[in-house]
Amino acid sequence: MRLLLCKNWFASPVISPLLYTRSLYSMANTTSFPIAPQAPPNWSFTPSDISGKTNEIINNSNNFYDSMSKVESPSVSNFVEPFMKFENELGPIINQLTFLQHVSSDKEIRDASVNSSMKLDELNIDLSLRHDIFLQFARVWQDVQSKADSVERETFKYVEKSYKDYIHSGLELDEGNRLKIKEIKKKISVNSINFSKNLGEQKEYITFTKEQLEGVPDSILTQFETIKSDKDSNETLYKVTFKYPDIFPVMKLASSAQTRKQAFLADQNKVPENEAILLDTLKLRDELASLLGYDTYANYNLYDKMAEDSTTVMNFLNDLKDKLIPLGRKELQVLQDMKAEDVKKLNQGADPNYYIWDHRYYDNKYLLENFNVDLEKISEYFPLEATITGMLEIYETLFNLKFIETKDSQNKSVWHDDVKQIAVWNMDDPKSPNFVGWIYFDLHPRDGKYGHAANFGLSSSFMIDDTTRSYPVTALVCNFSKSTKDKPSLLKHNEIVTFFHELGHGIHDLVGQNKESRFNGPGSVPWDFVEAPSQMLEFWTWNKNELINLSSHYKTGEKIPESLINSLIKTKHVNGALFTLRQLHFGLFDMKVHTCKDLQNLSICDTWNQLRQDISLISNGGTLSKGYDSFGHIMSDSYSAGYYGYLWAEVFATDMYHTKFAKDPLNAKNGIQYRDIVLARGGLYDINDNLKEFLGREPSKDAFLKELGLQN
């Protein structure tokens, strides 16, 4: 997942040393590299610092806009260039201040960051709806159109996008409607921040006895906090939080169907306070779209996406659903038969029907029994530090980069002791490396931290003047289990996929070469393409040779046996139709609630559960769960009416991989072409043109359909 912190101002985000564990990012001798020309950001903020800097930004921004509104005869030199400079310089500090709510271990700092986000979002809305500035941009837009051939491309695109974003935001409407729009946007912003805060701050858990957790190995049980039962002081209970490293193993390994059901429903029904926030937001979005002349919020939010409108999106999703359902039914029947056989053998009185909370368990059991895939055993060959070092080596080979971990004695350049800070260098000229930027790895869960996996762009690249570049800063935030006294953190294969994916976003952030920050990084491309670069890189995590090279058993240092890897790779598409149907549930729910014309009578709970049962094909067992209360994507300006983008982008990701890398995954020539054509150009050129140049033809969906088993 990609989270962009700073919205454009003109638009509407102890590892114990063990034998055979390589030191993190020690591939190069750091003394052979020059000192980075740009120091990493300083993270030693206090709540007072955050508040003070926020107020300073607000005052400076209002003063700047006031001065720009008074410019007579606005032109590129006296109006546009000052705006670009202002936007470039402001983005990094805003992103720092608002990022801390997701990662700081200090609740006072998180709260200050949330307050900063609310104030800065309100400022952004105020500024984006200033009619006097819109009129200035309208004058400049008219001027640059008349002499387009003599205007630099980035400048032209900047003015064009600014003007069109103003129109999209309703600046051509009368003052009364503009005020209504401003009020609605501010309410939506507050809702989004509170929804996210509730998720980040939740400390909910469910308790089980060891007997109830039968099937969950001791290696997992040791990571759970234990408490004594209120009913029996001699009984130990295990606290299972809803963080991924806790809840997923229970859903996957607990042999008790009742335990799985309780865990599933508790996880799905966490943060109940978010339901009212979501419902209010849906109504506000519908009202906003209506004011702006759109029939639905989906069509309003799709205006700058590749798909362009909700009809195209719904046709794409429904066509895919119809193709996948027959295959999904075949996959499901096998799993249903497995459960029925279990009930017949083990518990005559148990319910033989297959429910949504059974799926992770029987999916895992099927892999184990039919492919001899023991995911826990496989993880022993992928200790976190050694594996990430190996993954970075792949990125180094593909993109001609070098990753060098750096530290400062006072830890002012990181926000937590767990965080790794890495300088990235371009090695196109190995005798004279060029600095690329900074990337952070924040990989373990903790209280108050963002609970999923995401890349946060903290500062996009831009030119300060004709010869000096401000370098990008980006952060990977994940939640991999920490090491224990007995073993290091071990990565499951799906976690390796996750890291590869998020690092793909990070590389997109780092290699941008345009002059203006607005046109660099993932946030500069259409949001239904933004996942494609990362999805493409996931293919390397299914390559036999790359996985063997990555492996290093945490006790012996041995490479993983080929038999284990061969079995794992065979499972790539096992139950793939059911997995994709689950993604379609998210995408179609997102579109359903954002195209509904009668929200007053919409039961969001019934809609969520009925769609899941109909699309995923798996029974809800008569229960109603509220997974939408933790569906963070739907509260994002970018991902709302946009979750379809994961599948849409996968069409391009699969095409790029099979065309350029399937036969030679470490082809550096193709990797550098990809870096320079698809990534480094950002949003300055049409993404379809970039794809056509890189592929040597128009993009095709054939490889995507083959991957899904829908085409020979």
UniProtKB/Swiss-Prot annotation:
GO terms for molecular function: metal ion binding; metalloendopeptidase activity. Keywords: Cytoplasm, Hydrolase, Metal-binding, Metalloprotease, Phosphoprotein, Protease, Zinc. Binds 1 zinc ion. It catalyses: Cleavage of Pro-|-Phe and Ala-|-Ala bonds. Its cofactor is Zn(2+). GO terms for cellular component: cytoplasm; fungal-type vacuole; Golgi apparatus; mitochondrial intermembrane space; mitochondrion. Zn(2+) binds at H501, H505, H508. It comes from the Eukaryota. One of its GO terms (biological process) is proteolysis. It is found in: Cytoplasm. Pfam families: Peptidase_M3. The active site is at E502. Its EC number is 3.4.24.37. Could be involved in late stage of protein degradation. This is Saccharolysin. It comes from Saccharomyces cerevisiae (strain ATCC 204508 / S288c).
